[in-house]
Amino acid sequence: MKFELLNQVNLKKDHEIRIYSTCIGCTQCVRACPTDVLEMVPSTTCKAKQVVTVPRIEDCVGCKRCESACPTDFLSIRVYLGGETLRSMGLAY
């Protein structure tokens, strides 16, 4: 399975949220978010015909509850804080 980046939203230089093509449109991450940052939008990339998006990034507190709620093997939504991005993707040297 190919993991494509669907959306990347940067709040600050050191804080970003990435949405991957493995999103199945289940809404678990949306329901888990304590600050209502996420919402579902129509899409043809999954069977549920919807994927998550991040319209209110400025309200993200970096709690990563959306990651914990994601049922896919390859987390469809990831929150990166600081230098965490390269390390967590196995790309740091």
UniProtKB/Swiss-Prot annotation:
Binds 2 [4Fe-4S] clusters. Cluster 2 is most probably the spectroscopically characterized electron acceptor FA and cluster 1 is most probably FB. [4Fe-4S] cluster 1 binds at C23, C26, C29, C70. Keywords: 4Fe-4S, Chloroplast, Electron transport, Iron, Iron-sulfur, Membrane, Metal-binding, Oxidoreductase, Photosynthesis, Photosystem I, Plastid, Repeat, Thylakoid, Transport. Residues 13-43, 50-80 form the 4Fe-4S ferredoxin-type domain. It is a peripheral membrane protein. Its cofactor is [4Fe-4S] cluster. InterPro entries: 4Fe4S_Fe-S-bd, 4Fe4S_Fe_S_CS, PSI_iron-sulfur_center, PSI_PsaC. One of its GO terms (cellular component) is chloroplast thylakoid membrane. Coiled coil: none annotated. Its main location: plastid. It comes from the Eukaryota. One of its GO terms (biological process) is photosynthetic electron transport in photosystem I. GO terms for molecular function: 4 iron, 4 sulfur cluster binding; electron transfer activity; metal ion binding; oxidoreductase activity. Signal peptide: none annotated. It catalyses: reduced [plastocyanin] + hnu + oxidized [2Fe-2S]-[ferredoxin] = oxidized [plastocyanin] + reduced [2Fe-2S]-[ferredoxin]. Its EC number is 1.97.1.12. The eukaryotic PSI reaction center is composed of at least 11 subunits. This is Photosystem I iron-sulfur center. It comes from Bigelowiella natans (Pedinomonas minutissima). The lineage of its organism: Eukaryota, Sar, Rhizaria, Cercozoa, Chlorarachniophyceae. The gene is psaC.
